[in-house]
């Protein structure tokens, strides 16, 4: 049945104040968004409940004081709502909805549709939004729908609370209204995609074209989430309650096109239980019951957060240990690094990295007056008085906007604006609403200006960046908002200033960014190329490319590299590369001659010719940014799994920040562990610097040996969070020892000969496996989980295994069980044995270690020979129940002929449950 909001359904609601009288009368009584608005129905008037129901969470605040505050707020809100609804035309059944599942919903005809007919995603025209002032009329509030709007009945609706709670419950709407005290406050809601079209004009994101009106302010009333969770007896953190998940009722095409998915997301328990955050299960907006587009009959409101966390048509609240696993929780509302495109994000699991999730809004501001294409005549009248610039500003997390500044000279000087805060902070001092700003400027100053730009500051002194930071989802765009000015002749004999906003919402054409984009495309048209004077013998039939053109092809969609002046398109080879796609992607768009030569065989060099597409124009080339020293070569398929930069450890200085840069390190200590094993300590460039290498990944050590670049992969033996240095345990392969390798190891012998104080370079991180903690991994970007780890290593292959063991044992809450089989030629060849044995003795329930050597002395307590099925069955878990994950690092014959066949016999799914470093 359609959603009905006849007031007869709300028998348990307390009587309200007088309804708001609007400046028009609907042709038929009834709420405009009701499916029965065209039938006889009582008018849905604005309601404010009696103050006795106001929520009071502080014992030291008397109900009398609280009620007095609520009375004044109710009157204040009532007047603002009355003003905001003035001059508001009726909503209608839009013909564009006629053949959609939303055909029953009445909507305001002025709303700008951003995604065609359906689903309904819209924002108000910016000047219209501002015309109505501080409180946005509900029909003009922006709408974000992922699918059709559910049809709901108040009397039939329930909200289930389950998961880690002592008393799982289902609440009816009448119970939520009558059994809980409520909160009522004004809050600004903002879509994380607000101002996205500006980003789409630079480079297309995955999102549609929000303008700068994806923001609205309403008065919300609802039940505090923390009260509901307390009623249900939410568990403690130790009891497993770490996250609170929300799930709506709509059926959506989630995941890989599967039907029946619900929109869902989650927040941390600490947020959910914090009364200062005013998180509510809202059932009223601007004094009326929720409309269908805004979540009737109940939705989540989380002030200061992005709109994507505020689930509409709320059906379930689930208290969990892990964050929501909902498709929309991971594949939406993320700010990924600018280098990540859609294919890379999917292949390498950027969606699942927690540091890129968006919760709180960032600081933002917009110029609303002058509006787009407004013309200011320049005459004797207008030049005698200042022109008033206006706009809005907001911040997230309850932070107050404390300053707004405007520049008309490109940022050389700034003028401080007057601020209009029309809200009172809550009792915890938090501000949930936008503010308005204004500034009077001289018209002649505008006449000489090329643009007007605005930036805001909040109480934590956060401000907006000057330049845009593009990201795949096009979210949280908050660079300076710029309005361009141009001189025009609006009337004969008169000049004026015409103002241009950067974009217009949706598919509307216009804005200065569209013009600039057109000019850039025209300028980028390829000129006719002449033969390069610097390459007189170059084959003139080959296509020629500039360095700037090569730089553009730096992603998995189009991956070009330069080797010896030749250009190769490696895109179709990415997935076939033995070392993984990121070995190429990390060098995409650069000259990687030196590194290619350092690690590739003659066979590989011949194969490269199949991908040659042209030659590099070298005249005048002097770019440092794509020199060999600034490119990175790796051996893994997960470029995504770089160390979390900045957000995860904001107080730390990370060495491995730029994957295309080499980091100089100095040898400060060298320890001889055995006749052919050394431990090297390298100091990072800055004393307080951390390497920044995720667990499970490795680095490249770079050295110039005999005038040629040499690169080798190593996994540090030091902990990932050690400050100022890192350590490598390296086996030295001396020349003349092994008949198959008479020259020995080039890099290991070089390291052994290095004096203290020598400088080398490192690159990274690299690798397709990352351990996230508590049994969770990402492998080629996809999440995996295991209760038990079967870890098989041979020789120096122990180092990545050692790194994971070290990380697990360091976390007392990580209960992952580890079973290690470590094979070597002799007992003396066992690396890091003292540490392994010490851990096995200290943590017998968490780590078990078994050694295998080809030949042993008398009294050897472990296995002799090679890794066999019998040894594996005795010392590692089988793969029957799927709780174990096997991983191996060692010589290829060991993995190919011993480890993998026997794992298959032990019921391991080799494709899913076996990792090779």
Curated annotation (Swiss-Prot):
Question: In the record, what terms sit under GO molecular function?
Answer: FAD binding; heme binding; identical protein binding; molybdenum ion binding; molybdopterin cofactor binding; mRNA binding; nitrate reductase (NADH) activity; nitrate reductase (NADPH) activity
Asked if Cell membrane is a keyword of the record, the answer is no
Tell me its EC number(s), please.
1.7.1.1
Q: Where is the FAD-binding FR-type domain?
A: 660-772
Residues recorded as binding Mo-molybdopterin, renumbered to this chain, are 191
Q: Which residues of the sequence carry a binding annotation for heme?
A: 577, 600
Report further notes.
Answer: When mutated confers resistance to the herbicide chlorate.
Q: What family does this belong to?
A: Belongs to the nitrate reductase family.
Record protein name field:
Nitrate reductase [NADH] 2
Name of the gene? NIA2
């Amino acid at each position: 049945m359609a959603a009905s909001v006849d007031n007869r359904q709300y028998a348990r609601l307390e009587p309200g104040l007088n309804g708001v009288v609007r400046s028009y009368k609907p042709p038929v009584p009834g709420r405009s968004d009701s499916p029965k608005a065209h039938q006889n129905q009582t008018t849905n008037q604005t309601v404010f409940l009696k103050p006795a129901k106001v929520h009071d969470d502080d014992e030291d605040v008397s109900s009398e004081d609280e009620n007095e505050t609520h009375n004044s707020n109710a009157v204040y809100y009532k007047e603002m709502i009355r003003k905001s609804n003035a001059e508001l035309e009726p909503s209608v059944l839009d013909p564009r909805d006629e053949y959609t599942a939303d055909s029953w919903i009445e909507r305001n005809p002025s709303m700008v549709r951003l995604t065609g007919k359906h689903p309904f995603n819209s924002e108000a025209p910016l000047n219209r939004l501002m015309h109505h002032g501080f409180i946005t009329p509900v029909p003009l509030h922006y709408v974000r729908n992922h699918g059709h709007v559910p049809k709901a009945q108040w009397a039939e609706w329930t909200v289930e609370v389950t998961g880690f709670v002592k008393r799982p419950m289902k609440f009816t709407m009448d119970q939520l209204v009558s059994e809980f005290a409520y909160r009522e406050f004004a809050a600004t809601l903002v879509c994380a995609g607000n101002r996205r079209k500006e980003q789409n004009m630079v480079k297309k994101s995955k999102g549609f074209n929000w303008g700068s009106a994806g923001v609205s302010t309403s008065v919300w009333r609802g039940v505090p989430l923390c009260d509901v969770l307390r009623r249900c007896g939410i568990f403690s953190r130790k009891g497993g309650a770490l996250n609170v998940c929300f799930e709506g009722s709509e059926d959506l095409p989630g995941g890989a096109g599967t039907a029946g998915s619900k929109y869902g997301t989650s927040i941390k328990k600490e947020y959910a239980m914090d009364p200062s955050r005013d998180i509510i299960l809202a059932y009223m907006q601007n004094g009326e019951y929720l409309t269908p587009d805004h979540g009737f009959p109940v939705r989540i409101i989380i002030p200061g957060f992005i709109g994507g966390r505020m689930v509409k048509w709320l059906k379930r609240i689930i208290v969990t240990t892990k964050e929501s696993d909902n498709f929309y929780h991971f594949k939406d509302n993320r700010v990924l690094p600018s280098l990540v495109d859609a294919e890379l994000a999917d292949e390498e699991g950027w969606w699942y990295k927690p540091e890129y999730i968006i919760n709180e809004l960032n600081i933002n501001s917009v110029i609303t007056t002058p509006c787009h294409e407004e013309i200011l005549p320049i005459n004797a009248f207008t030049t005698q008085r200042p022109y008033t610039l206006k706009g809005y500003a907001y911040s997230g997390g309850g932070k107050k906007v404390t300053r707004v500044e405007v520049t008309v000279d490109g940022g050389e000087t700034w003028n401080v604006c007057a601020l209009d805060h029309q809200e009172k902070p809550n009792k915890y001092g938090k501000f949930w609403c936008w503010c308005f700003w204004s500034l009077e400027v001289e018209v002649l100053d505008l006449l000489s200006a090329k643009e007007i730009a605005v930036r805001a500051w909040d109480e934590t002194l956060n401000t907006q960046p000057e330049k845009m930071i593009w990201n795949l989802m096009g979210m949280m765009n908050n660079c300076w908002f710029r309005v361009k000015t141009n001189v025009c002749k609006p009337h004969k004999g008169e000049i004026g200033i015409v103002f241009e906003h950067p974009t217009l919402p949706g598919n509307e054409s216009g804005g200065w960014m569209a013009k600039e984009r057109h000019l850039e495309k025209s300028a980028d048209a390829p000129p006719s190329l002449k033969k390069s004077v610097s390459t007189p013998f170059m084959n003139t039939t080959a296509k020629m490319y500039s360095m700037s053109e090569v730089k553009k092809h730096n992603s998995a969609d189009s991956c070009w590299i330069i080797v010896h002046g030749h250009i190769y398109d490696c895109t179709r080879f990415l997935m076939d590369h033995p070392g993984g796609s990121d070995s190429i992607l990390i060098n995409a768009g650069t000259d990687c001659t030196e590194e290619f030569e350092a690690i590739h065989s003659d066979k590989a060099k011949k194969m490269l010719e199949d991908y040659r597409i042209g030659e590099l124009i070298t005249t005048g080339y002097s770019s440092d940014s794509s020199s060999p020293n600034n490119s990175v070569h790796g051996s893994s398929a997960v470029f995504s799994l770089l160390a979390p930069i900045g957000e995860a450890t904001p107080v730390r200085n990370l060495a491995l920040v730029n994957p295309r840069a080499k980091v100089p390190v100095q040898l400060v200590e060298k320890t001889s562990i055995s006749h052919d094993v050394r431990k090297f300590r390298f100091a990072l460039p800055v004393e307080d610097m951390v390497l920044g290498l995720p667990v499970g990944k490795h680095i490249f050590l770079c050295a110039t040996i005999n005038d040629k670049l040499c690169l080798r992969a190593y996994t540090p033996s030091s902990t990932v969070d050690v400050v100022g240095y890192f350590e490598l345990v390296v086996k030295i392969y001396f020349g003349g020892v092994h008949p198959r390798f008479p020259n020995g190891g080039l890099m290991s012998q070089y390291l052994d000969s290095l004096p203290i104080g020598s400088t080398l370079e490192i690159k990274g991180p690299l690798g397709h496996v990352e351990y996230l903690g508590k049994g969770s991994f990402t492998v080629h970007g996809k999440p995996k989980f295991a209760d038990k780890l079967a870890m098989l290593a041979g020789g120096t292959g122990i180092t990545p295994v050692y790194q994971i063991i070290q990380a697990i044992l360091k976390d007392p809450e990580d209960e992952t069980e580890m079973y290690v089989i470590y094979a070597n030629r002799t007992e003396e060849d066992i690396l890091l044995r003292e540490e392994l044995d010490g851990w096995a003795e200290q943590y017998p329930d968490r780590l078990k270690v078994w050694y295998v050597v080809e030949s042993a002395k008398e009294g050897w307590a472990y296995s002799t020979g090679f890794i066999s099925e019998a040894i594996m069955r005795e010392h590692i878990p089988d793969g029957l129940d799927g709780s174990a994950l096997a991983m191996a690092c060692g010589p290829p014959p060991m993995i190919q002929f011993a480890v993998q066949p026997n794992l298959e016999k032990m019921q391991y799914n080799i494709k899913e449950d076996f990792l090779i470093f």
